[in-house]
C-alpha cells in the first residue's frame, strides 16, 4: 500500500512539482496549549451543521401554505398548520433517523455559537487580537454575528409556536427603528408579519447565503492564522520570532482528527439521549396562544433580557412615536461596534503599536481583564433577565421585582466585578513577584537562634554570598508555586488502571522519556543560541 501511495505521489510531483511546497507546509509547528482547541470545536461543529443540514433539506418544505395535519403524531391530527411545521413533524416522526439528525443539528448550532464565544473570550483575555492580528479579530466578530443570525433563522423555520413568537419580537424591533425600520422589515419579511414568503426568504438565507459567507470567512480566518503563524504563551525558549510545539504532520493532524471525532461523538450522544426543541409539544404558531416561558436559544436569550429590563422610554416626534424597544436595537449596535473596534481602542489608549506573537496572562493586564469580566457579568445578567418570568414563577417572586433586580444589577454588579477582578489581578502579580524574589514555600519550619520561627523557601535561581535568593525577572510565563512543579515530587509509577507495567516496560519507557527530555533541552539551548546570535547580529545586545 505504501509503495502505491509513493508511486502516486511521485507521479503527481513530476507533473505539478508540489513536494517542495507541501513539505514546507506540513512541517509547520503549532503550539500545544489546550485553549487553542476551542476554535477547533467551532470548526467541527460547523462541519457537522453542514452535513446534518444537507440531510434535513431533503425533507423540509419552508412553505407557509396552510394544510390539515394527518400524520404519525396523533395529538395534532386534524389541526391546521403550515407545510413548514408539518414537514418538521414528518422529519421528527416519519423520516428514518430524522429526529436524531434534527436534534444533532440543533445541538451543533448551539455548540458552534457557544464555542465561538468562548474562543473569542480566550482571544480577548490573552491579547491575541493585538497587532498584527486585528483583521482576524474582526473576522471572528463577524463570524459570531453571522452564527447568531444563522441560528435564529434556523430555529424560526419550523413555524412552531416558539419560533413564531421569536419572529414576531424581531419584527417589532425592526419596525420600531426610526426612518429605516419599515424598509428593513419589507426587505427581510417581504411585507407585513406574517408574510407568505418570509420563510422562503429565511430558508434561502439559512441554507445558502449565510453558510456560504461563513465558509468563506472561516477559510480567510484559517489562512491568516496559517500565514501569520500561531500565537503562543511565554515559556522556555519561546520568543516573538519562533513557535514551539508539534508539527502539523503527523501529530497535530492525528490529534485534530481525534478531537473532531470526540466532538462528533459528544453531539451524537446529546442528540440521542436528550430532547431539544420538542416542536410537537408547542403546536403551530398562533398569536392568541403566546404566553410566558417563550425564551429563545441561549445565545439569543440576552437580547430578550435586554428588551425585558429596558424601561418604557418612548420618544415622540410630532405625530411619530418611537417605541422603547428602539433602545434595545441601539444597545446591540453599540456593543457590536465596540467589540469590533476594541483592538484599536486599546492600542490608542496604551500606545502599544508593536507586533505581538507572545500571549499575555490575564493577570498581567488587569484593566483589560477587568473590562472583560465586567462585560461577561453584563451578558450573564441579561441572559438571566431573559427568563425573569420563569424565575418569578418558580420562586414565587413578583415579575416586577425581577425586572427591577435586573435593572439595578446591570448597574451595580458589573462595577463590582471590575473592582474585584482588578484587585485579584494585582494580588496575583504580587504573588508571582514574591516567589521570584524569595522562592517557593517548602512547608519546612525552622527555628532561629533568637527563638523566632521562619518557613524555609526554595530559591528558583542563584543565591548571593549570604545564601539569600537573587530576585529573578518576570518573563510573562507561569511561575511555579509548588515544589512538585520543580521535580521534587516522587516519580509516578507507570501502568494501567488495574496494575503497573512490567519492570522491563517501565524501565524502557523511562529511558525513552529521559532521552526525549535531553533532546528537548538540547533543542531549547540551540534555539536560545540562535536567538542570541541573531540579536547580536542585529545590534540588540
Swiss-Prot record:
Binds 2 heme groups non-covalently per subunit. InterPro entries: Cyt_b/b6_N, Cytb/b6-like_sf, Di-haem_cyt_TM. It holds the Pfam family Cytochrom_B_N_2. It comes from the Bacteria. GO terms for biological process: respiratory electron transport chain. It catalyses: a quinol + 2 Fe(III)-[cytochrome c](out) = a quinone + 2 Fe(II)-[cytochrome c](out) + 2 H(+)(out). Its main location: membrane. Keywords: Cell membrane, Electron transport, Heme, Iron, Membrane, Metal-binding, Respiratory chain, Translocase, Transmembrane, Transmembrane helix, Transport. It is a multi-pass membrane protein. Heme 1 binds at residues 105, 206. It is found in: Cell membrane. Its EC number is 7.1.1.8. Heme 2 binds at residues 119, 221. PROSITE patterns: CYTB_NTER. SUPFAM superfamilies: Transmembrane di-heme cytochromes. The cytochrome bc1 complex is composed of a cytochrome b (QcrB), the Rieske protein iron-sulfur (QcrA) and a diheme cytochrome c (QcrC) subunit. This is Cytochrome bc1 complex cytochrome b subunit. It comes from Corynebacterium efficiens (strain DSM 44549 / YS-314 / AJ 12310 / JCM 11189 / NBRC 100395).
Amino acid at each position: 500500500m505504501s509503495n502505491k501511495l509513493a508511486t502516486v505521489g511521485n507521479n503527481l510531483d513530476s507533473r505539478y512539482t508540489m513536494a517542495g511546497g507541501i513539505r514546507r507546509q506540513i512541517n509547520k509547528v503549532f503550539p500545544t496549549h489546550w485553549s487553542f482547541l476551542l476554535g477547533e470545536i467551532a470548526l467541527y461543529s460547523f462541519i457537522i451543521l453542514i452535513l446534518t443540514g444537507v440531510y434535513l433539506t431533503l425533507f423540509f418544505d419552508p412553505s407557509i401554505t396552510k394544510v390539515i395535519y394527518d400524520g404519525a403524531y396523533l395529538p395534532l391530527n386534524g389541526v391546521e398548520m403550515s407545510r413548514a411545521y408539518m414537514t418538521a413533524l414528518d422529519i421528527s416522526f416519519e423520516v428514518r433517523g430524522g429526529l436524531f439528525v434534527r436534534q444533532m443539528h440543533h445541538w451543533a448550532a448551539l455548540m458552534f455559537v457557544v464555542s465561538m464565544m468562548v474562543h473569542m473570550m480566550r482571544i480577548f483575555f490573552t491579547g491575541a487580537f493585538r497587532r498584527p492580528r486585528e483583521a482576524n479579530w474582526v473576522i471572528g466578530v463577524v463570524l459570531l454575528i453571522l452564527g447568531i443570525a444563522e441560528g435564529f433563522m434556523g430555529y424560526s423555520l419550523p413555524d412552531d409556536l416558539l419560533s413564531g413568537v421569536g419572529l414576531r419580537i424581531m419584527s417589532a424591533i425592526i419596525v420600531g427603528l426610526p426612518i429605516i425600520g419599515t424598509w428593513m422589515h419589507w426587505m427581510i419579511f417581504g411585507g407585513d408579519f406574517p408574510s407568505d414568503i418570509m420563510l422562503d426568504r429565511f430558508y434561502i438565507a439559512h441554507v445558502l447565503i449565510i453558510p456560504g459567507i461563513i465558509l468563506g470567512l472561516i477559510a480567510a480566518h484559517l489562512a491568516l492564522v496559517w500565514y501569520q503563524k500561531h500565537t503562543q504563551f511565554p515559556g522556555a525558549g519561546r520568543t516573538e520570532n519562533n513557535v514551539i510545539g508539534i508539527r502539523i504532520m503527523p501529530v497535530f493532524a492525528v490529534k485534530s482528527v481525534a478531537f473532531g471525532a470526540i466532538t462528533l461523538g459528544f453531539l451524537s450522544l446529546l442528540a440521542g439521549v436528550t430532547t431539544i426543541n420538542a416542536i410537537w409539544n408547542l403546536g403551530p404558531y398562533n398569536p392568541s396562544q403566546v404566553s410566558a416561558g417563550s425564551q429563545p436559544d441561549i445565545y439569543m436569550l440576552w437580547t430578550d433580557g435586554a428588551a425585558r429590563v429596558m424601561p418604557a422610554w418612548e420618544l415622540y416626534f410630532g405625530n411619530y412615536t418611537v417605541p422603547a424597544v428602539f433602545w434595545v436595537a441601539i444597545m446591540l449596535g453599540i456593543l457590536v461596534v465596540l467589540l469590533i473596534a476594541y483592538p484599536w481602542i486599546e492600542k490608542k489608549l496604551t500606545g502599544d503599536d508593536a507586533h505581538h506573537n507572545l500571549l499575555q496572562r490575564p493577570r498581567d493586564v488587569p484593566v483589560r481583564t477587568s473590562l472583560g469580566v465586567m462585560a461577561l457579568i453584563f451578558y450573564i445578567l441579561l441572559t438571566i433577565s431573559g427568563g425573569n418570568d420563569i424565575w418569578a414563577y418558580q420562586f414565587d417572586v413578583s415579575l416586577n421585582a425581577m425586572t427591577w433586580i435586573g435593572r439595578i444589577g446591570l448597574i451595580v454588579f458589573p462595577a463590582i466585578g471590575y473592582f474585584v477582578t482588578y484587585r485579584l489581578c494585582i494580588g496575583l502579580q504580587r504573588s508571582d513577584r514574591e516567589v521570584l524574589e524569595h522562592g517557593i514555600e517548602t512547608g519546612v519550619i525552622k527555628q532561629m537562634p533568637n527563638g523566632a520561627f521562619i518557613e524555609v523557601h526554595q530559591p528558583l535561581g542563584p543565591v548571593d554570598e549570604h545564601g539569600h535568593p537573587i530576585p529573578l525577572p518576570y518573563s510573562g510565563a507561569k511561575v511555579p508555586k509548588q515544589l512538585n512543579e520543580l521535580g521534587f515530587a516522587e516519580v509516578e509509577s507507570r501502568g494501567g488502571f488495574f496494575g503497573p507495567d512490567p519492570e522491563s516496560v517501565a524501565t524502557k519507557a523511562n529511558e525513552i522519556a529521559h532521552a526525549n527530555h535531553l533532546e528537548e533541552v538540547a533543542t531549547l539551548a540551540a534555539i536560545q543560541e540562535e536567538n542570541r546570535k541573531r540579536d547580536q547580529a542585529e545590534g540588540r545586545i
